[in-house]
Amino acid sequence: MAAPCVRLGSVRCTGTLLRYFCGSARHRAAAASHEEIDIPRRKSWDKTAVLQALAYTVSHDPTAAHYMFQDEPFLAPKTSSEFRLYSLSKESGRNAAKYIIGTYPNLFQNDVAEPHIPCLMPENLQPQVEGVSEEALKERIQLRRVKESVDLFDQLLQGGTAPSLETTNKLLDLISFYGDREPVRDIQTSEQEQQEVQDQQETEDPKKRPRQYRKASEILGSWRENNNAERIFNLMPERNAHSFCTLIQGMAKFGSSSKAFNIYTDLMNNRLTADVQTFNALILAAPDIKEKYNEKWDLIVELLKHMVQQNVRPNLLTFNSVLKSLRKCGPMAKGLALQTINEMKALNIEPSLATYNHLLGVFYKGALSPRGQTEILSEVLDEIEGRSFTLRDPDDVYFFTNAMRVCLDLKDIELAYRLHTLQQTADNRGLMGDFYLQSTYYGRFFNLLCMMESIDIILKWYRELIPSLYYPNSRGMLDLLQALDMDNRLDLIPQIWKDIKQIGHSNKVELVEEVLNLMARDIQPPELQAAFGDTALDIKSLYEVKDRVRVALEWSAGSLGNVSALLARAGKTVEAWKMLQLFKKSHRVPSTEVLDEFLSRAKVDANTNLAISLVQLAVGFCLPNTAKLAQRVMEEFTVSEEQRLTLEDLQKSHSSSSSSSSSSSDSDRE
């Protein structure tokens, strides 16, 4: 990538970069100390202060449904897929209502509110000013009609009427903010974007498509070469700082970092001053300009120096942008990140959760990081524990999820408890982000609990989190089953299986087979064995229902054998025998252990005919232990002379078939 025209200088240290701002802050603080203190006569309360006070008196109810579903408790979802479908359906209905009201506002003019409440009345989203005029252009800009605004601007120029600088800057704001694309409405997507997605899906193999995080510019779209924003900017007879800053921010937002720095160079050549938002955008784009880590940092420092020279005071987002860019600066970023935090404190700028999130990103790169470097999370929690935060940076919502990932990689349950306590403090739970981020946070927390805690504590959290706050995926339920196995609490498996069905994971093959393996591994007391048998029958019914489910379960030799063994141990001989018949139908071969288990059940029931039928089944499968099976029947069962002859014939037929198969294999080798 071509380097911008900005001249970079070498930087020796960064501790005094923003000392100018520190001095200004101290000067203002000294001046303020001589001012008179004006004590207000009354305290101003927020409009929802009473509701907030009432909310603090109520703790979380793990049995209550999500607040989104309070209106329809009957339709409250029980699975993650139902949650997604319900929430999307509700939001779709709300957006559809907004669309109808916005499209036909004349049908909703009955104002019954006294006094008048403007927000309850429909907004007029259709243009009212006709013709080619600057007023019509302002209206299209206000309505966020990108294409119509550009067309109207061109018509004004062709008619010899140039819009004012203020109006042109507003148009430039609109085009740069949306990347010269129509904004995505509430219930519709741009036809061009839909076509791009469709073309991409047709040309790419979904199996070979890499699963990785994309840049923000890739999600938003790229900055097209010579788009309307650049064209209008070049057509402007006069430009002010706002014109340059708008174009720079748009280019940086949509991934055209090199162009953004070129425009910034033009801004400086015109002796104009950039605002703090523009510097923030350039700092975020700086790592994309340079290749080496030290060059990336030098460019960031150069921008900070320009802020000092242009008397632009940094804000919280400035320092967060520096920390976010430092995440791309390799090992050298650790010391620089701490210096950045010290600069924030010197300027009396309170860090936000995004600040600490970027700090974790700088110091913690993965589970293989040295232990001493990962203790930064403990120090962060020491500083922010017990505090209440508000949303001050869009990246604030990523802190809890990423911090819990650090706890999981470190397998530090105490840190996880401290983090969760912070999340429960005041209104901090409102900074969890969307449903995906919340589910990721609770999933990692529950995974760590299953690895590190006893089963009693795990079940306590299980009842508190599920399903009121978290719908576990199949991986989470597997972790719970492994925890039950480690603490030898297999008696809880029947109840957990009911939860698995309710949550909607009964069609996950790995999960179903893990349940069967745990139940069939050891012989349990009769009462528990009977419960296992009922669970095995329930699982068997899932394999038989194939028309009403999208993902049908297919019998494997292991699942067939486990269900057969569980039914035999539970005394359900008829059902167990039917399961043995399914082996041949499913083209599977029963194991020796399954046949021994079934023969033991036949011995308990003193059912000689069933034992002989089992030997006949083994002969049909040409199992190597058929002779031992027949010998065991003759020794352990009371057989008649006719039955003995039958068993001997079965042994002879098995021996002859075995010898013929071995001779054929020898001839094949010759």
Swiss-Prot record:
Name the GO cellular-component terms. mitochondrion; ribonucleoprotein complex; ribosome
Segments carrying the region annotation (Disordered) are: 187-213, 648-670
Principal place of residence: mitochondrion
The keyword Acyltransferase is assigned to this record? no
Which superkingdom, per the lineage? Eukaryota
Q: Which Pfam families match?
A: PPR_3 (PF13812), Rib_mS39_PPR (PF22330)
Q: Where is the composition biased (Low complexity)?
A: 653-670
Which segment is the transit peptide? Answer: 1-13
Q: Which UniProt keywords apply?
A: Mitochondrion, Repeat, Ribonucleoprotein, Ribosomal protein, RNA-binding, rRNA-binding, Transit peptide, Translation regulation
Where are the annotated PPR repeats, by residue? 129-163, 164-199, 209-239, 240-274, 275-314, 315-351, 352-392, 396-430, 438-472, 473-507, 556-590
Instruction: List, alphabetically, the InterPro entries matched.
Output: Pentatricopeptide_rpt (IPR002885), PTCD3 (IPR037387), Rib_mS39_PPR (IPR055063), TPR-like_helical_dom_sf (IPR011990)
| Biological process terms in GO annotation | mitochondrial translation; regulation of translation
| Subcellular location, record wording | Mitochondrion
State the Gene Ontology terms under molecular function: ribosomal small subunit binding; rRNA binding
Q: Residue ranges under compositional bias (Acidic residues)?
A: 193-203
Q: What does this protein do?
A: Mitochondrial protein that may have a role in mitochondrial translation.
Instruction: Give the family from UniProt.
Output: Belongs to the mitochondrion-specific ribosomal protein mS39 family.
PANTHER family reported for this sequence: PENTATRICOPEPTIDE REPEAT DOMAIN-CONTAINING PROTEIN 3, SMALL RIBOSOMAL SUBUNIT PROTEIN MS39
In its UniProt entry, what is this protein called? Small ribosomal subunit protein mS39
